[in-house]
Amino acid sequence: MTTLTITVGPYTYTARMEEADAPATCAAFAKLLPYKQKIIHARWSGEACWIPLGEFNLNVGYENHTSHPAPGEILFYPGGFSETEILFPYGATLFASRMGQLAGNHFATIFELSLIHI
């Protein structure tokens, strides 16, 4: 099991890469490590934060995709209808943009859910 250490402000989380269910996304994202971006609160998706990535292309298609991630299920949206992004849900979330409902690749899961701060 490959793990990630994720730091958001003063908080640090440990997540497992979902390599069995999203192998292409995990492999492509792993090549970017260490990864650093700004995270902002989501506008359309509910209780989530997101990392807008514009036209960035990770060269992956859809795999293990969902519109309804549980808290801690991190999604990568490969772009198409809306800009590329990473979604970091911490509560009730329906992944969407101003274009409507989206689906993203669930590629990592925070497994210390009690540590997610709302």
Name each model-derived stretch:
Residues S82-G91:
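Short, Lys/Arg- and Gly-enriched loop/turn segments at beta-strand edges
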Residues M1-I39:
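Start-of-domain signal
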Residues N59-N64:
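Short alpha-helix capping/helix-loop boundary micro-motifs
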Residues H41-F56, R98-G100:
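Short, basic/aromatic beta-hairpin or loop at an interaction surface
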